[in-house]
From Swiss-Prot:
Gene: tagF
Broad EC category: transferase
Binding annotation for CDP-glycerol: 443-447, 511, 545-546, 582-584, 624-625, 629
Superkingdom in the source lineage: Bacteria
Protein name: Teichoic acid poly(glycerol phosphate) polymerase
UniProt GO molecular function: CDP-glycerol glycerophosphotransferase activity
Keyword Transcription: no
Cellular component, GO annotation: plasma membrane
SUPFAM superfamilies associated with the record: Nucleotide-diphospho-sugar transferases, UDP-Glycosyltransferase/glycogen phosphorylase
Membrane topology, record value: Peripheral membrane protein
Chemical reaction(s) catalysed: 4-O-[(2R)-glycerylphospho]-N-acetyl-beta-D-mannosaminyl-(1->4)-N-acetyl-alpha-D-glucosaminyl di-trans,octa-cis-undecaprenyl diphosphate + n CDP-glycerol = 4-O-{[(2R)-1-glycerylphospho](n)-(2R)-1-glycerylphospho}-N-acetyl-beta-D-mannosaminyl-(1->4)-N-acetyl-alpha-D-glucosaminyl undecaprenyl diphosphate + n CMP + n H(+)
Length: 721
């Protein structure tokens, strides 16, 4: 007979149920029973569950509930079916490490409970237990009983069935989300000895794919969560008889209030107003604990709440933030300029004739913001123009524009005063876009790879899928206008960026005006070639690959390994061609072109990619949006997609049919590519029909007047203010 039962309850968990069950199937010991409860799912969860266990050689107890009643009820139903001496819960959106059950059974030693850590989602998971890292300790219940409560979860705890049955312990079905303490607190009363595991992962939380729809606890709506947390707190206090346990629960509640009503939260005003009555009630209940452990300014806020003076309490809450900023300024800390901005930014600061521009986070003077600025500088010279740069001294801006250094006092002043912001990438969320400011987002390419809300998973440093999507959503909510180059992009932007179509301007990219207006301006083209010191008798190949989400070295910096085989290209093409290498702006590593000085040129830091398009006889790319801009010229394109399987399926995925819709041949190895590059005219003729179709679908909106459209729009807006 097995000693342990694993209980899995699920409701509409189609994104996770397969991974959860696979983690059970992959346990290195199968000496356990399994109970699976379908809590009235209405999606494809049951079908996927059936598929996942169809070849699983285990006698599973299935329970199907007619309607969703919450996981407290589902777990209580499952408890009636447990036939083993011990049991544990595994949430359907979580997974067990393959070594977990083996290790648990080895260490349990017939105690009354085993507590193992719960880790956040990660793709980097160990395959074996590191015995030098893991720590196992046995406790008497009187010593460290609060261990059961630390994660506020009943998952990854092994319970003794006899204790639960003898004392009829059940989950409180009147609670919605924070139901676990109701069960664990009752169970703790009867524990004598237990074992706790430290310092090594055994249980992983599932990844959140859609933070706006997910049922995952940490990502649910705050208003609903906080209300249920408070209800669970009062329920827990009633159940807790041990003074140490009560103190632990009270401390948890105090920390919860401090964290959720932290003055710097962007939605603190809304939170405070919505939950002010609850805060009053909690302050009265917790006043001894809170006042004892708080700083003076926090105590004043608590006392005001106790006296039901919520408006004054909120002012004190915000004064706490003010004090921090003042401290940063007085002590001249590195973020003192930002603190000054937060303290002084207000709508009255806005000056109608001031426009601030930024391109690629201040990297250079380039892209659509450049062309909008140059149009406005020519036709509306009396406005005040400001450009934001990481390194202002390294960027030359024609005309009268002021240059400011990112995160300097002048930078914050510019964003506080400008009536219009123009950027081609996201701006920091700590910049406060006020009601009387207009934010024009030009964006920086027709999308091929999935973006933001359309990405199932995000594999970027310094963030998680839900955090990335929530922050992106906050950013796009500030955009008053988003420029789209075509109908294809408009449809994608609506979904990926949570945009309503009224805010989308389908006018083509301002940066592409030059491709329409100057493609046949030979004098202009010769100037560009001369500036780059290109030989006049050689054709120009441009190689512009994208960055890979998973090849990062740090936040915002990515590596790129040149797979195109320059040596072979040089041998095949060196007599008649030069190649321009244009890395994505997020690529941080410099290219080593030693030995190819007369053949390969790194133009990654050349500010204007449109000028490079104009002098290139053909383009090599992979999954970069440059293909859409270059398509305006109707010249040959080659697609070097050496990692197509990984990129299409494992990373972001594509919006279009990559294998069918491209205006040129696809190569997965460099040698065939090198040979085909010798025959540009042949490729042009062979793919002319696809080149024309590609142009009609993605490039035909670009008419050379997008910069004028935006410049005139800003001018009109200023005149009407």
């Amino acid at each position: 007979m097995n000693k342990l039962t694993i209980i899995v309850t699920y409701y509409n968990a189609e994104e996770y149920i397969t991974g959860c069950l696979e983690s059970i199937k992959q346990q290195r010991t199968q000496d356990f029973n399994l109970i699976i409860v379908n809590d009235g799912s209405t999606d494809q969860s049951k079908k996927l569950m059936d598929e996942a266990i169809k070849d699983y050689d285990k006698n599973i107890r299935f329970i199907d509930l007619d309607e969703n009643s919450g996981h407290a009820h589902a777990r209580n139903i499952a408890l009636e079916e447990v036939e083993t001496p011990y049991f544990m819960f595994l949430d359907a959106d979580d997974e067990l490490a393959s070594y977990a059950i083996t290790f648990y059974l080895e260490k349990f030693n017939n105690t009354d409970g085993l507590i193992a850590p719960i880790h956040s989602f990660t793709t980097q998971r160990p395959q074996f237990v590191d015995l030098d890292r893991v720590r196992v300790e046995y406790f008497n219940a009187k010593e460290n009983i609060n261990s059961f409560l630390r994660k506020q979860s009943a998952c990854n705890i092994i319970f003794r069935t006899a204790i639960v049955r003898a004392h009829h312990i059940r989950f409180n079905e009147n609670l919605n989300t924070y139901v676990d303490w109701s069960f664990v607190l009752e169970y703790m009363k009867y524990v004598n000895k237990f074992v706790r595991i430290f310092n090594f992962p055994f249980y992983f939380r599932g990844e959140v794919y859609d933070p706006f729809e997910t049922l995952t606890l940490s990502e649910q709506n705050f208003d609903i969560l906080f209300k249920d947390y408070v209800n669970s707190f009062y329920d827990a206090i009633k159940r807790a008889t041990n003074p140490k346990v009560r103190e632990f629960i009270v401390t948890k509640m105090g920390n919860k209030i401090a964290n959720e009503f932290e003055p710097t939260r962007y939605d603190i005003n809304e939170r405070y107003q919505t939950h002010k009555d609850t805060l009053v009630e909690l302050s009265k209940f917790l006043h001894v604990h809170l006042v004892k452990n708080q700083k003076l300014i926090n105590k004043i806020e608590t006392i005001l709440l106790m006296n039901n003076e919520t408006d004054k309490a909120f002012k004190v809450n915000q004064f706490r933030k003010t004090l921090r900023h003042v401290k940063n300024i007085v002590l001249r800390r590195k973020n003192k300029e930002r603190s000054l901005y937060d303290l002084t930014d207000k709508e009255d600061n806005v000056k109608p004739k001031t426009i601030v521009f930024e391109s690629f986070g201040g990297k250079n003077y380039s892209d659509s913001p450049k062309y909008i600025y140059e149009y406005m500088q020519k036709y509306y010279p009396n406005y005040r123009y400001i450009w934001s740069f990481k390194n202002p001294d390294k960027n030359v801006v024609p005309g009268s524009a002021e240059k400011v250094k990112r995160n300097s006092a002048e930078y914050y002043q510019a964003y506080s005063e400008a009536s219009h912001w123009v950027s081609n990438a996201r701006t920091p969320l700590y910049l406060n876009k006020k009601e009387n400011q207009t934010y024009i987002q030009t964006w920086h390419g027709t999308p091929l790879k999935r973006l933001a809300n359309d990405m199932k998973v995000v594999r970027m440093p310094g963030t998680t899928t839900p955090k990335y999507k929530r922050n992106f959503n906050r950013e796009t909510s500030r955009w008053d206008y988003l420029i789209s180059p075509n109908r294809y992009s408009t449809e994608i932007f609506r979904s990926a960026f949570w945009m309503d179509e009224e805010r989308i301007l389908e006018i083509g990219y301002p940066r592409n005006d030059v491709l329409v207006n100057r493609a046949n301006d030979q004098e202009y083209l010769d100037e560009i070639r001369t500036h780059l010191n290109l030989p006049s008798d050689k054709k120009v190949i441009m190689y512009a690959p994208t960055w890979r989400d998973d090849e990062f070295v740090s936040k915002g910096k990515y590596l790129f390994e040149l797979k195109i085989d320059l040596d072979n290209l040089y041998k095949e093409l060196g007599d008649d061609y030069v190649i321009l290498l244009r890395m994505h702006y997020l690529i941080s590593n410099a290219l080593d072109l030693s030995g190819y000085e007369n053949f390969a040129i790194d133009v990654s830091n050349y500010n204007d990619v449109s000028e490079l398009f104009l002098i290139s006889d053909c383009l090599i790319t992979d999954y970069s949006s440059v293909m859409f801009d270059y398509g305006i010229l109707k010249r040959p394109q080659f697609f070097f997609a050496y990692d197509i399987d990984k990129y299409d399926k494992g990373l972001r995925g594509f919006y279009m049919n990559y294998m069918e819709d491209l205006p040129g041949p696809i190569y997965t190895e460099p040698y065939g590519l090198a040979k085909e590059l010798k025959n540009l005219d042949k490729v042009q003729q062979q793919y002319q029909e696809k080149i024309d179709a590609f142009y009609d679908r993605f490039c035909s909106v670009d008419n050379g007047k997008a910069s004028q459209y935006i410049g005139d729009l800003i001018h009109k807006d200023i005149k009407e203010q």
